[in-house]
């Protein structure tokens, strides 16, 4: 038996020990604890606005903190800032690379960011003195595509990449201040905790990891999915997070329990999940699917509470406003829809 085989065996044994230790701590299931809670009932949402203007597939969207403006990124090579109340375009920003995969709105509303197959995170200043929007920084350092980015503030942004790492950047200097390495597959998505001290990442190694922003350490690793994790989103209180995967399930993981609490799936759903988001209370989990629909799950009961149907192609991205009053879905059909 070679040394490598021995190490593999040891690693497998350790994994099993961890699994058994977690099981021993699980004194009850979420289903048992929520048995006496009333079901949510049927959730019916209507399309209130359709945002038309992109000429190709929409790949990403992100709400501003004002719950009114949102940014979207499309294969047409444009980043558009929309006013969701009026459906007007506030800015249409031509990109240097049209292969964009992610976009983000800074909490201050001063900046937006985007990136994709160019491996670069481009930061755009929306509040220049001249009134025009221009690139204020190009953050180059990843050796793979940029899959997701989120601002901590106007000078710090976290990115995830196909090079299996995440990174924290100082925007002013354009340098990576911390690299978060540990995944063994492309990192597809990240989500910041409400206090922004932690973030979670989901990757093509089918695992999710919890990271400490300041220390650059992986705090916890969560397994259970059987395929790539495409989307990840923190629970509003920061104690749990949801993931969406190509294995056709969404899952809820709890940081304190250190394990999976719930699986959201249905025999009729056989396609992958592209995006996930919680309602403001956390009671509903919204998930976008490859079959053109967005399913609304009762997060506590794992029942399907509703469906948002209206797109003619894959739902690629979705987001809930900070005030919890609206949901936006973006699709490969080139439209964004606002629901409530």
From Swiss-Prot:
GO biological process: G protein-coupled receptor signaling pathway; positive regulation of neutrophil migration; posterior lateral line neuromast primordium migration
Keyword Repeat: yes
One Gene Ontology CC term in the entry: heterotrimeric G-protein complex
GO terms assigned for molecular function: signaling receptor complex adaptor activity
PROSITE patterns for the chain: WD_REPEATS_1 (PS00678), WD_REPEATS_2 (PS50082), WD_REPEATS_REGION (PS50294)
WD repeats: 53-83, 95-125, 141-170, 182-212, 224-254, 268-298, 310-340
Top-level taxon of the source organism: Eukaryota
CDD domains in alphabetical order: WD40
InterPro entries: G-protein_beta_WD-40_rep (IPR020472), Gprotein_B (IPR001632), Guanine_nucleotide-bd_bsu (IPR016346), WD40/YVTN_repeat-like_dom_sf (IPR015943), WD40_repeat_CS (IPR019775), WD40_repeat_dom_sf (IPR036322), WD40_rpt (IPR001680)
Keywords tagged on the record: Repeat, Transducer, WD repeat
Chain's role: Guanine nucleotide-binding proteins (G proteins) are involved as a modulator or transducer in various transmembrane signaling systems. The beta and gamma chains are required for the GTPase activity, for replacement of GDP by GTP, and for G protein-effector interaction.
Assembly information from the UniProt record: G proteins are composed of 3 units, alpha, beta and gamma.
Similarity remark: Belongs to the WD repeat G protein beta family.
Name of the protein described by the UniProt record: Guanine nucleotide-binding protein G(I)/G(S)/G(T) subunit beta-1
Source organism: Danio rerio
Gene name of this polypeptide: gnb1
